[in-house]
Structure formats: C-alpha cells, structure tokens
Design a protein with these regions (language model features):
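Small-residue-rich segments of transmembrane alpha-helices in multi-pass membrane proteins
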Residues: 93-95, 178-188
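Divalent metal-coordination and catalytic microenvironments
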Residues: 78, 165, 185
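Alpha-helical transmembrane segments and their immediate juxtamembrane interface regions
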Residues: 147-181, 236
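Non-catalytic, topology-defining segments of multipass membrane proteins
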Residues: 1-158, 191-237
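Alpha-helix C-capping/helix-to-loop hinge sites
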Residues: 83, 166-170, 188-191
Length: 237
C-alpha cells in the first residue's frame, strides 16, 4: 500500500487539489513570462529614452496619462466587454464581425476564467491578445513620442495587473494590499459578487463607478477597518 493510499479520502482530495493548483500556477506564470519579456522590454526602452531626452519633464508628463488610460480601459473592458453576453448581430457587416468575435472568443475566455478560477490557460493573457494594440501604439509612437510614452506606461500597468491577478489566485499574503486584493477579487468570482468589484488591481475605481460591494459584504470581507487599494483608507460616501 502506498503512502497516498493510507491517507483519508479528504486528505487525498486536498493533496490532489494542491497539486492541481501548483500545476496551473506554473502554466499561468510561464504565459506571463512571455508577455513580460516582450512588452516590458519595449516599455523600459521607451521610458529610458524619455528620461534621457532633452525635455525630460515633457516626456515624463505623459506617464500619468498612460496610467489613467490604463485604469479606465482595465475597468471598462472588464465590466462592459468581458462581462457582457454577446449575441451575433446581422444589422451591419461591422457589427456582425465584432459580435461574432465576442461570441467566439471573449465570452468563452472570461466565462471560462470565472467557472475555473485556477485554470492556468484561462488566467493570463497571451502576447497575441494585445499585439494589435501594441503594434498601433508603438507604430504611432515612432512619429509622436508622447504616444510611445503613453503606450509604454499602459503596458507596464498591464503587466503589473497580470502579475497581481496571478498572485491573488495562487498565493497567500501578509502584506495588507495583497490581502485586500485577494479578498476583493476572489469574492468577484462568486455568483453574488460578479456584478461588483471589477477593479483587478485596486478597489478605488469601483468607488467612483458605483460598483463597490454592498456595505454588508465589505464588512464581512474586510472587517470594521475596510481598506481600499494601497493606502488602506476607503473614501467616504
């Protein structure tokens, strides 16, 4: 009799589940390695050029624009695209193209992530997912350097979101920010939480977009001293 066979059924189930999570964590992490290698390299080069340019302040002034652009695009895509149930429309060829794209790719991708939150194949983005945006942003950046800075900043934020999202699913933390984000995001994966908590790296934007969890849920998740994002101080309604 093997050591595995001597374990109680519950222990065998828990060991199997932990092994499954470790396996999926590796799959997800290796996908992020690839996207990080490409997009971080470009972004670092552009930001170094901005710092070394003759007009440093002018170049770096567009970093906040990139951050704001990222926060808005992350939230709106998560709430209004990934959580939208597409139906193929025959109204116009263009509308048919985009709705077919949604039905074929976007719906299965995010629905699969919610149904199997530890599936590494549905966890992290691939290089090709954002390649069109990268090509457009980097291409325009050749002629308009501020666009390159905005693109580089956006992709740095995207990579940070990918790693934070990966971490909230697979790791446990003592750090207050990550403990907060793990509770915030994992509750979003429940049936009751899917209509709230669309910010993946911060709960601040949910406050401004009126998609925070209800008060009784926040009390249960965070306790009396609720924290929001990095500063651990939630704005008062």
């Amino acid at each position: 009799m093997t050591a595995e066979q001597t374990l109680a059924p519950q222990e065998r189930k828990e060991n199997s589940y932990r092994a499954y999570k470790r396996e999926q964590e590796v799959i997800s992490r290796h996908k992020i390695y690839k996207t990080t290698a490409l997009y971080a390299t470009y972004s670092i080069i552009i930001l170094v050029l901005a710092i070394r340019s003759g007009s440093v302040l002018w170049g770096l002034a567009f970093i906040p624009v990139g951050i704001i652009f990222w926060m808005l695009s992350e939230y709106t895509s998560h709430r209004y695209i990934f959580h939208h149930k597409f139906e193929v429309s025959e109204e116009t060829p263009l509308k048919k193209f985009f709705t077919t794209l949604g039905v074929k790719y976007l719906d299965p991708m995010h629905t699969g992530h919610h149904e199997r939150p530890f599936d590494g194949n549905h966890m992290s983005g691939r290089i090709r997912d954002l390649l069109p945006m990268f090509v457009i942003g980097a291409g325009l950046g050749i002629f308009f350097f501020p666009v390159a800075v905005i693109t580089a900043t956006w992709f740095i934020c995207y990579l940070a979101e990918e790693w934070i999202h990966h971490a909230t699913h697979f790791y446990n933390f003592r750090d207050p920010y990550f403990r907060y984000m793990k509770k915030h995001h994992m509750y979003h994966h429940t049936k009751q939480g899917m209509k709230y908590g669309f910010g993946t790296t911060s709960g601040i934007i949910d406050y401004f977009w009126n998609s925070r969890y209800p008060e009784h849920i926040r009390q249960r998740l965070y306790g009396a001293k609720k924290s929001i994002a990095a500063n651990q101080a939630e704005p008062q309604a």
